[in-house]
Amino acid sequence: MLPPTVTPRLHLGLAMWANPEWRGSLYPPHGGGLEEYAQVFSTVEGNTTFYSGPPKADTVAAWSRQAPRHFRFCFKLPAALTHENRLAGVESAVDAFLASLAPLHDRLGPVMVQLPRDFGYSELPRLDALLSRWPPDIPCAVEVRHSEFFHKGMAEIALNRLLISHRVDRVMLDVRPLFSPPHDEHPGLLKAREEKPRRPLHVLSTADRPLVRFIGHYDEGLNDRCFRPWIDRLVLWIKQGKTPFLLVHTPDNRAAPALARRCYRRLCDHLPLEALGPFPGERQNRLW
């Protein structure tokens, strides 16, 4: 666990902190809160805000009490703004959403703007308008899913230039493990493949907080092979003074903590990173 005054050079985390499947491994049998999660990981995706909108004030206050100073939340802009309104006329709603997170402003990682699969080149002016008025003290990252942003043509060039001009990161969604053989019929794999877009991986850091969402498989060897190229890239970004965010998933996320630890240990073979804290659940198991 990091001392509260130390800022990580790389933030490692998962898609959530509350998952009962992690009891007995990441968490003790009756644990599973943010405070225990933050003993190990230094960031988390905030998917709850994508589906539920701005969190309540007492909820944010509780998160603020439980998360150490080095921790970073990567909340998602609500789907009501990105998918229902498609960033049109959302200025006051964006302001209200960011204001709801005010107690956590010193612990915000990139707020993720996840755009719909059909949000393409013609709608980039709306994204430009959003980023033009984005508060400079709150990091931001954009995840696109439209196929025309993955062909290295006019649309992708325009997108990347837009993000660079606003010093906003482009989310890199790595689904190679998920869609690689073996293509078995495991229900978790099938469900994850339905939910995640199958897009090429374009590795590009457009700002100072490159954000990688690594979607693993059940096959550890496959995960190792797919993660191997990330090691050199993450090392390079850190040496350039950037602070990468690595968010690790597995198909049903049951094995995500173990995969995240495995990836981090491989990075530690190449960089003098801070040690990852022991899993509270494993620590308690050893006591017994």
Where are these regions (language model features)?
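Residues lining hydrophobic/aromatic ligand-binding pockets adjacent to catalytic sites
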Residues: 1-288
